[in-house]
Amino acid sequence: AVLIGHVAGHTSTIRVGAGGIMLPNHAPLQVAEQFGTLASLYPGRIDLGLGRAPGTDQAATRALRRYYQGADEFPNDVMELLQYFEQAAPGQQVRAVPGAGVEVEAWILGSSLFGAQLAATLGLPYAFASHFAPDMLEQASAIYRQKFRPSARLTKPHVMLALNVVAAESDAEETRLCTSQQ
């Protein structure tokens, strides 16, 4: 979140965001307040990509979020996080400050069919990590588009792809660079 604020503060029109907050490592309220702050400072320019991968080993995961039950909680955590961006209801005990009523474009990140189905069910944009799972790209995109349910956040499916791209001064150098990524 710190670098997002720095980049947004030095630009005026581009959208800036996280290409992956691994939600298993963070409490939804904490993420909502951080991104609510950013969206309050830079309205209409902040994106929040949400992933379910731990991104680290078990010891670090426990240190980051000791009570976490596992990736199975991800859909509930996403829904909880999105709730914090809604207008606070009368009597609501826990609120994101700032965050409630703030527009943050949330994306589901994934490299499997699970993420595609979740994004479709929640009516959220989907970013597919084809650099991790290129063979799943077509199937995940098709499932997302077929199962997409319009929501208050998004009326039609929206897919973004993360790709590896290699540019080099010669074919030989390009081949060397490509094979080093495999």
Which residues does each PLM region occupy?
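Active-site-adjacent structural elements that line small-molecule/cofactor binding pockets in enzymes
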Residues: A1-Q182
